Amino acid sequence: MWYNNSAGPFLLTGFLGSEAVHYRISMSFFVIYFSVLFGNGTLLVLIWNDHSLHEPMYYFLAMLADTDLGMTFTTMPTVLGVLLLDQREIAHAACFTQSFIHSLAIVESGILLVLAYDCFIAIRTPLRYNCILTNSRVMNIGLGVLMRGFMSILPIILSLYCYPYCGSRALLHTFCLHQDVIKLACADITFNHIYPIIQTSLTVFLDALIIIFSYILILKTVMGIASGQEEAKSLNTCVSHISCVLVFHITVMGLSFIHRFGKHAPHVVPITMSYVHFLFPPFVNPIIYSIKTKQIQRSIIRLFSGQSRA
């Protein structure tokens, strides 16, 4: 059954009962929004302009920054619209589209996996690095990661169009999440309970296992290096990536746990966890790489001091 076009739009709620402080909350979100745009935008400009950053690792970082910007662009305008302008209504199609674009979380997981592969190649077979990760191969990997994310979530989103919706039109958050929308469906939603578990297991959690295995091999290689200074230099290459992996997967597991087992948790807990999941990684990723990657630090200095690019 196709969803009822005559049914009213969904209503975004969010921080119910705290309307008096919506302005303060929105200002905090606006600062985070600006920081995400500035941080990831600056990273993209650096990689675009600085020829010394035209290497596979930085191309993958550019993909990560693009993904973080996409997540933010599709979430924050809706959030700010609810908090500042009280624009709570959202059409079914717009809601489903927003849920679809949230598949960028799976894309981000794939990019973090690819960055682990990049680190693995750089440390295990450094002399063959440029032969293995050619520009065409980097492009194909990026397209593959993007297609995997979108295609894996497509069955869930298409199923949303097939359900009738009745009863309350209120959604828990200030943006559309599949876990939230499906609760309003008046039909058998067994598929929408089982498929996300399989999907997440075969993408995000499998990616995490492969990353762990790759770092076990990386550590074995590094421990075989005679010089302690060279060990530290090799590991420092991957510290920023490990930090981003931890940030992403901790927030994913937190959000999944809350939606699966936190039915009796206070209203504000799942809402806060969803914001942490969608905003914290895009906020900290450029900071982590700027602090831990010397090439990016030098590029930032050249950019803001007006020096010629490498």
Curated annotation (Swiss-Prot):
Belongs to the G-protein coupled receptor 1 family. GO terms for cellular component: membrane; plasma membrane. One of its GO terms (biological process) is sensory perception of smell. The keyword Membrane applies. Odorant receptor. This is Olfactory receptor 51B4. It holds the Pfam family 7tm_4. Residues 1-23, 74-97, 158-193, 256-270 are extracellular. InterPro entries: GPCR_Rhodpsn, GPCR_Rhodpsn_7TM, Olfact_rcpt, OR51/52/56-like. Residues 45-52, 118-136, 215-234, 292-310 are cytoplasmic. The chain crosses the membrane at residues 24-44, 53-73, 98-117, 137-157, 194-214, 235-255, 271-291. Glycans are attached at residue 4. It is found in: Cell membrane. It comes from Homo sapiens (Human). Keywords: Cell membrane, Disulfide bond, G-protein coupled receptor, Glycoprotein, Membrane, Olfaction, Receptor, Sensory transduction, Transducer, Transmembrane, Transmembrane helix. The gene is OR51B4. It is a multi-pass membrane protein. The keyword Transmembrane helix applies. Disulfide bonds join 95-186. One of its GO terms (molecular function) is G protein-coupled receptor activity. SUPFAM superfamilies: Family A G protein-coupled receptor-like (SSF81321).
